[in-house]
Amino acid sequence: MMDASKELQVLHIDFLNQDNAVSHHTWEFQTSSPVFRRGQVFHLRLVLNQPLQSYHQLKLEFSTGPNPSIAKHTLVVLDPRTPSDHYNWQATLQNESGKEVTVAVTSSPNAILGKYQLNVKTGNHILKSEENILYLLFNPWCKEDMVFMPDEDERKEYILNDTGCHYVGAARSIKCKPWNFGQFEKNVLDCCISLLTESSLKPTDRRDPVLVCRAMCAMMSFEKGQGVLIGNWTGDYEGGTAPYKWTGSAPILQQYYNTKQAVCFGQCWVFAGILTTVLRALGIPARSVTGFDSAHDTERNLTVDTYVNENGEKITSMTHDSVWNFHVWTDAWMKRPDLPKGYDGWQAVDATPQERSQGVFCCGPSPLTAIRKGDIFIVYDTRFVFSEVNGDRLIWLVKMVNGQEELHVISMETTSIGKNISTKAVGQDRRRDITYEYKYPEGSSEERQVMDHAFLLLSSEREHRRPVKENFLHMSVQSDDVLLGNSVNFTVILKRKTAALQNVNILGSFELQLYTGKKMAKLCDLNKTSQIQGQVSEVTLTLDSKTYINSLAILDDEPVIRGFIIAEIVESKEIMASEVFTSFQYPEFSIELPNTGRIGQLLVCNCIFKNTLAIPLTDVKFSLESLGISSLQTSDHGTVQPGETIQSQIKCTPIKTGPKKFIVKLSSKQVKEINAQKIVLITK
């Protein structure tokens, strides 16, 4: 028997964190374990009890998941002195210096994602230590990886950028909502790896970004005792955080990781924010995407149907589809070897719980190419996403005739769904319109051909798509966004094929609602009868500010005014309808910050706001946040009267170098949020 004192033993493994982190683009992760990307070489330094001899045994064992097994690809055994290809993993000795040896390890570009234990076996001795844990991620820098992205600027944006924004508001009034993705913050990657374990994925499924993406999408929403975030669209957020108050993903994922309890509460941009963070952390290129006038087609018939009574009020018992002023989801970049050729690239993934897919609340990944072509049965959930961005919209008038309900199509819009699909531009703080990636131009022959193709695939009767009758009346409604506290004007534009003098009855029904279309308060009905002459004429309805101002303070959401307008020509009984949404505009505020700062030196942010509105603002707060600089800080300012100016100083001390984005927010009972931001370069 060999003398134990002469047996080779590994005393310590040096993961050479600094060098490996730079080459693997993982230096910013705040985690105690080394982080590597698959398909790329990394180096280890083994500290031995004696110089390595030719007769010594030396094997590296990488294991992941419960009961690791070579047959299941969850255990990889490598001998660095006998170059071999073990499931496309390789190890070679690079350098020997006394009692230290350097080993180069290259994992497979198809390796299982997640947490690995590294053990080193030397004869009868095995070095096992919880310190020798490593994380293995997808690698968009590796050509053989399914998530390979060829453009370096895009990799920097969709993998390495930890700040960004969501686009919210309305199609005519798009607003930027800054968002800290924070994929490198403490415990965020640990949370993402933990979510892989908690999901229904088998370890071998974790090789495939399609399956990982789908599983992470499902894990974002709470269901059956599992999931990160609880959705809430009621307007009552007692016991949690109102969705609009979140400014980033990291606090949500950190809270979930620390408590293992679902976080309260989220809406679409919050779900999209945390999914984008999780995918970027795991190495899947991801971007936040917003579609305006986004449809929710519950009947899965590629149309959005709204039913109204003769007063212009929505009949909720019949109307199950909805149109959201905006909806935010995530695009993820990957190859799709599970599909026919041509569907690689961006895939839509929607973490907001809307409809079940294969029994769980998740949507996608759906190839943008399939959505654009109308290939609605390409997996996953392409039919649902297609309807979100390219459905037709019908408004039905329900009339009682001799005690029976009669349905009349009073509006059919083929261009109103899926406007201004937006994402942050690569390397710039500006909006990029990517509508063309989702569909052909509205009204083009290609777009109509795609709709015909989609309906043919659906094998649906298309009675409603045939002209009901020749329309001699066409109507549109215009309304500019209004400064909070002012009256709102709705201009009804009527176009006729005759210039004859006629009488028109205009009925407008107005309500305060959430961006999802949920009614929060009935405001009023406005009626007007006018004589019109000429082929084009205008009629204006004015909504007084008193009808909406008192309802704002009771809402803990960003509201919009919905106007539903019905016009009827008295002489011909011709009826048309249109729906219009109006958002509120708010005064801006200014921030004063230096352009540069240093680690350890105090930074002071001066916030200045003048209330130029005609109403007082109550419960006014300033808040500031910056990744690596300052966690969320808030200062209270009570009530700010019309014309009054307030100032606030918020102080912080930087702890990380680089360009850092400061996000400052003002909020009140009446104004839910106004944002300002500035980038400060922090040096040593």
From Swiss-Prot:
Its cofactor is Ca(2+). InterPro entries: Ig-like_fold (IPR013783), Ig_E-set (IPR014756), Papain-like_cys_pep_sf (IPR038765), Transglutaminase (IPR050779), Transglutaminase-like (IPR002931), Transglutaminase-like_sf (IPR036985), Transglutaminase_animal (IPR023608), Transglutaminase_AS (IPR013808). It catalyses: L-glutaminyl-[protein] + L-lysyl-[protein] = [protein]-L-lysyl-N(6)-5-L-glutamyl-[protein] + NH4(+). Ca(2+) binds at residues 390, 392, 442, 447. PROSITE patterns: TRANSGLUTAMINASES (PS00547). Binds 1 Ca(2+) ion per subunit. It comes from the Eukaryota. GO terms for molecular function: metal ion binding; protein-glutamine gamma-glutamyltransferase activity. It is an enzyme of class 2 (transferase). Pfam families: Transglut_C, Transglut_core, Transglut_N. Its EC number is 2.3.2.13. Keywords: Acyltransferase, Calcium, Metal-binding, Transferase. Prostate. Belongs to the transglutaminase superfamily. Transglutaminase family. Associated with the mammalian reproductive process. Catalyzes the cross-linking of proteins and the conjugation of polyamines to specific proteins in the seminal tract. Homodimer. This is Protein-glutamine gamma-glutamyltransferase 4. It comes from Homo sapiens (Human). The gene is TGM4.
